[in-house]
């Protein structure tokens, strides 16, 4: 039974949001420099790059860089269109996380609840010719706030006294 979200199901949710967005053809995760753009032939591509986690009272913020990119013709004649389409995809993803009802689907029988949130303004930055092949797109840092009760009763640790 999962009452609170964690890193694994947050990544899985982001991957599913990418898969649900009909323009995105490929979703990848991990360090952006490990992505093999030559082998990923289906574009537009969404890449999820974990940045860090911030522990707070009763919650944790997981920060991710989200890259949305597409191929640009060698003469760059479609670069403006690629940037426009990729920005629209970014807007869709951010809107879903801020307002989307798809995150409110939960399995009440299993004790699950919709516990993903994002807060504040999100800056979306364009990039062109950033990687080895001709891709352009946008990147933004996405803070995902998840509930976390820091329950030490279920932590896999000895319960003997540790202080001196």
Predicted regions and their residues:
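A short, hydrophobic beta-strand-centered structural micro-motif
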Residues: 39-51
């Amino acid at each position: 039974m999962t009452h609170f979200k964690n890193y694994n199901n947050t990544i899985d949710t982001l991957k599913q949001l990418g898969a649900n967005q009909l323009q995105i053809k490929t979703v990848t995760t991990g360090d952006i420099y490990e992505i093999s753009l030559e082998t990923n032939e289906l574009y537009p591509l969404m890449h999820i790059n974990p940045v860090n986690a911030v522990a707070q009272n009763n919650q944790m913020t997981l920060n991710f860089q989200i890259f949305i990119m597409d191929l640009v013709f060698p003469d760059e004649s479609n670069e403006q269109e690629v940037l426009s389409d990729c920005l629209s995809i970014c807007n869709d993803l951010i809107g879903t996380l801020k307002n989307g009802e798809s995150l409110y689907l939960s399995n009440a029988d299993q004790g699950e609840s919709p516990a993903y949130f994002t807060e504040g303004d999100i800056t979306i930055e364009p990039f062109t010719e950033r990687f080895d092949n001709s891709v352009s797109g946008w990147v933004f840092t996405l803070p995902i706030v998840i509930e976390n009760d820091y329950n030490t009763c279920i932590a896999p640790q000895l319960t003997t006294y540790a202080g001196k």
